[in-house]
Amino acid sequence: MKLSDIYLELKKGYADSLLYSDLSLLVNIMEYEKDIDVMSIQSLVAGYEKSDTPTITCGIIVYNESKRIKKCLNSVKDDFNEIIVLDSYSTDDTVDIIKCDFPDVEIKYEKWKNDFSYARNKIIEYATSEWIYFIDADNLYSKENKGKIAKVARVLEFFSIDCVVSPYIEEYTGHLYSDTRRMFRLNGKVKFHGKVHEEPMNYNHSLPFNFIVNLKVYHNGYNPSENNIKSKTRRNINLTEEMLRLEPENPKWLFFFGRELHLLDKDEEAIDYLKKSINNYKKFNDQRHFIDALVLLCTLLLQRNNYVDLTLYLDILETEYPRCVDVDYFRSAILLVDMQNKLTSLSNMIDEALTDERYSAINTTKDHFKRILISLNIQLENWERVKEISGEIKNDNMKKEIKQYLANSLHNIEHVLKGIEV
């Protein structure tokens, strides 16, 4: 019986059961295809009531995180059986803060080896629980998660499901990531792979099934107002380059290398690597970062006004991901640029009409042209030109009309600004 069928049967007849409640935390339950042996739904419900909740270790790797470690640990301290911090010999107060405020947290030490997977796998070696969950020091575990992660582990353990678990991670921009792969069973089958942008994989490098779960974590590590993004990116790009040397055809590393080049303001090189990544996805079964590569490439092409290539890759994006609304965003942006170009052409045409020797039967001052020209330049946000043209108008009534229009616009803008909270 499929897990999704079990869920639907529970919803129909046992919606008040603990099993249904805990299964409801699995967001993409309909995607799990493996069959599960079931005697009866009633026996499942009864068996789950008697089942044990597995223990969970929370693992954190740190180096000089004195500004953030307290908030991070406070957010997780009550939801896990064991917390292990692996410190790479911090030179700030990170360790002192942990020892003083979190005496139950186990601290291990390991020199930094330029390999995030090595550090995470070390924590796996130290962990004594049945499951492990990883959080970063720049993450906050939502208060709304209280007790949920144990329920997730319990229900997956009950059905003997081997998988990785992904909470939602909310970025400082508000964007939610769902493919985050933070928790898995400690049965020796899963280890981290990759010196950077690491992820848990099976021992044969295949990808475990990924369950998205209804938990939320907040990530602030890439907020430019609070972090040195360039420094972090320079560290990452060196490690990504090492992974590229090891796996030169892997589109994942080509994508991340391109993304990091972009963050270092090297967009021409970034575009080349993103194109290589997209091309290589044709040869790989793992398509997870395909959409990310396409969207970033389209963004860079739009910024550089390369509409020929943008249209080409937009077609690929629309074909591969027909439900991705960003296709409409990019096509709207292209139309907006086209409209702005047409407005500019119209403005230039009127400028010529103002300076040539043809006469006007409407008004020999040609102020009526200037009225249109002002409207065009307001839309183009060419304010110096608006000021210049306004000074050339001879009709006082038209000047008053324009001044009132601008005053009303300013009033409306100020009203909007008051409603924007930052």
UniProtKB/Swiss-Prot annotation:
Q: Which Gene3D superfamilies match?
A: Spore Coat Polysaccharide Biosynthesis Protein SpsA, Chain A, Tetratricopeptide repeat domain
Q: Record's SUPFAM superfamilies?
A: Nucleotide-diphospho-sugar transferases, TPR-like
GO terms, molecular function = glycosyltransferase activity; UDP-glycosyltransferase activity
Ordered alphabetically, the record's keywords are: Glycosyltransferase, Transferase
A Gene Ontology biological process term: protein S-linked glycosylation via cysteine
Enzyme Commission code: 2.4.1.-
Role played = Transfers a hexose moiety onto 'Cys-41' of bacteriocin sublancin-168 (SunA). Accepts UDP-glucose (UDP-Glc), UDP-N-acetylglucosamine (UDP-GlcNAc), UDP-galactose (UDP-Gal), UDP-xylose (UDP-Xyl) and GDP-mannose as substrate.
Q: Which family does it belong to?
A: Belongs to the glycosyltransferase 2 family.
State what protein this is by name: SPbeta prophage-derived glycosyltransferase SunS
Source organism per UniProt: Bacillus subtilis (strain 168)
